[in-house]
Amino acid sequence: MQIQFHLYNTLSRTKEVFNPQDQANVKMYVCGPTVYYNPHIGNSRSGVVYDLLYRIVIKIFGEKAVKYVRNITDVDDKIIDRAALLGVTIDELTDKVTKEFHKNMAYLGCMLPSIEPKATKHIDVMIAIIERLIAKDHAYIADNHVYFDVLSAPNYTELSNRNLEEMFEGVHVENSKTKKNPQDFVLWKPAKQNESANMNFESPWGLGRPGWHIECSAMSYKYLGENFDIHGGGADLIFPHHTNEIAQSRCAFPSSTYAKYWVHNGFLTVNGEKMSKSLGNFITVRDLMDKQIQGEVVRLFLLSSHYRRPLDYNDKAIEDAKKTLNYWYRAIENINVQKIDLPHDFMQSLLDDMNTPLAVKIINDYAKGVFISKTEEERQLNASAIITCANFIGLMNKTPNEWFNSGVDELYVNELVNKRLEAKKQKNWLLADQIRNQLLEEKIILEDRPDGTTIWRKE
């Protein structure tokens, strides 16, 4: 039976059955980071959401049939400004932040994309597309800039579903006096005086660099062609970035529809407020790593809400995710779990526009099943379902022992446990209680067994 994957398409504003142009060559493009600052937890939501989408598409069509491109934006005004602020070179900054991004994605359990192109390596493709746009009267040169003529693009507002005046209301428009229309956006900008040479490139319009929007059009065209299946990114990219991508790509290649399905994940707030440096609530993934919050906890938190809905980061949400994972790991403890076929109800939840809250509930139900099972066979079946489902969404990649004792000095704990056992033999109950309380303060829980032994676990 043909698997039907329903995916919400921002372009049509409906859930559609995902039907790629070629089932043997499924193409997916996701906007990656601009590498000027360590990625924050909002960026990480996008990484995890599209990692899950990639896993689902692979499950349906096979790994060899799917090409996933996620770019690195390493040419941008923000990069120039931050490098100058830090007193480092452009390359030093972009290399450092790119490496940090890769560490963050590994920490969150994200698979590598098929291709990860850098904008600076594709300037020639950008120039070629800009030349096509000029030749077709969709772009023009003014004051050493190349601009895209927004009014020349059919259906410019299709993705955002707003009229042109609404879209630009309150938006700061640069160089409005030199443009044909205030809404026109830059395709190529000239180099500024005293600017770093490695952030500017030779072009038919002089030394300069590309605008942001042309970069993704060029890299998606290079690796996926004029038409591809999925384009993903955060909801904040719908306008202007994705709107402008569609306009310039369709105008450069008139027979192209560009991306067929547009997928956008919702915003992430911190304690109910928009994340910003001025509010002091700007949280990077590195901050979470330094707090020794396990990556699986953050990943489950990011999957706990439907990807299109807003998600609020707070201590309780992280603690809830940790408790859930503890529950799942406890459920499979001391059981010989085996990989089984993905349960039908679990897979159906993901095929319904990646309904991860329902998927998580189903895993919880299997965990409950372990604890109420009346036979060992039932326990094993439920535990095997837990690990199979959790692994599919990128979770539970450790043994229960590794999970509960992560970051613990086992030698130190075992020494104290043995010291406590000796104290109990000597009926030194005061010392035994002191050791238990000391370990409890360090979030180590002791469990005395009827046979006289003591086992321990991290809280």
UniProtKB/Swiss-Prot annotation:
Its Enzyme Commission number(s) read 6.1.1.16
Listed GO biological process terms: cysteinyl-tRNA aminoacylation
The record's InterPro entries line, in alphabetical order, gives:
Cys-tRNA-ligase, Cys-tRNA-synt_Ia_DALR, Cys-tRNA/MSH_ligase, Rossmann-like_a/b/a_fold, tRNA-synt_1_cat_dom, tRNAsynth_Ia_anticodon-bd
Gene Ontology cellular component terms for the protein in this record = cytosol
Alphabetical list of CDD domains matching this protein = CysRS_core (cd00672)
Q: Where is this motif: 'KMSKS' region?
A: 274-278
List ligand-binding residues for Zn(2+). C31, C216, H241, E245
Q: Which enzyme class?
A: ligase
Co-factor binding details: Binds 1 zinc ion per subunit.
Could you tell me the superkingdom of the organism this chain comes from? Bacteria
- Name the UniProt key words of this record, in alphabetical order: Aminoacyl-tRNA synthetase, ATP-binding, Cytoplasm, Ligase, Metal-binding, Nucleotide-binding, Protein biosynthesis, Zinc
Give the residue ranges of motif 'HIGH' region.
33-43
Q: Which SMART domains match?
A: DALR_2
Reaction(s) catalysed by this chain, per the record, are: tRNA(Cys) + L-cysteine + ATP = L-cysteinyl-tRNA(Cys) + AMP + diphosphate
* Residues binding ATP, per UniProt: K277
Instruction: Provide a Gene Ontology MF annotation, just one.
Output: zinc ion binding
Subunit-level organization: Monomer.
Q: Which family does it belong to?
A: Belongs to the class-I aminoacyl-tRNA synthetase family.
Q: Which NCBIfam families match?
A: cysS (TIGR00435)
Question: What name does this protein carry?
Answer: Cysteine--tRNA ligase
| UniProt source species | Rickettsia africae (strain ESF-5)
